[in-house]
Design a protein with these regions (language model features):
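Binding-site signature for planar aromatic cofactors or substrates
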Residues: 6-177
Length: 177
């Protein structure tokens, strides 16, 4: 065995020891081509999702928090945003989208191509655009040696009955497109 092979074996052994010292973690940075069943279920419930697109004017990342999100399948996610949102114009210029979610004790980055399904949802008082993301890659991006103790939550700051009614209308509308 050559000198370089010995160093490689020592490095692998070192990495495994570090992994066990820090109590696990995602040393492999697992990459999947589709959503897991757990992520599909999470993306069918109310949750906070970060959406990253490329700003069409500045060509820098643009990140927004959204909650009207629904996973149709392991390969398709829909979300709704105000039609004036920068996300809409960004996707018109560049279809690349990254959705980030904190769930299942970790942080996941979901990359894909976004397509505007409708510029304005029918039957909803707000002017909402629906975008569908075709999932291309799912990465567990949680830093090594840690897990999420709790998932982020939020509270609605407007009329709860009106919010529930609107949320239901948007969810049904996204599914039916």
């Amino acid at each position: 065995m050559g000198k370089n092979n010995i160093f490689a074996i020592q490095k692998i052994s070192y990495d495994k020891n570090i992994l066990s010292i820090f109590g696990g973690g995602n040393m492999a940075n697992v990459v999947e081509p589709t959503l897991t069943d757990d992520l599909v279920q999470t993306l069918r419930k109310e949750c906070i999702v970060m959406v990253a697109t490329t700003d069409f004017e500045k060509q820098v990342p643009n990140v927004s928090a959204i909650s009207w999100v629904y996973a149709l399948s392991k390969t398709s996610i829909r979300f709704a945003v105000d039609q004036r949102s920068r996300i809409v114009e960004n996707i018109r210029h560049s279809t690349g989208v990254v959705l980030t979610i904190m769930a299942n004790e970790s942080v996941f980055s979901i990359s894909g191509a976004g397509e505007i399904l409708t510029d304005r949802m029918e039957g909803i008082s707000l002017k909402l655009t629906v975008i569908e993301v075709k999932v291309q890659e799912v990465r567990d991006v949680m830093f090594y040696g840690a897990k999420l103790a709790t998932e982020p939550t939020y509270e609605k700051t407007y009329d709860l009955r009106a919010a529930k009614k609107l949320d239901n209308q948007v969810l049904v509308g996204m599914k039916e497109l």
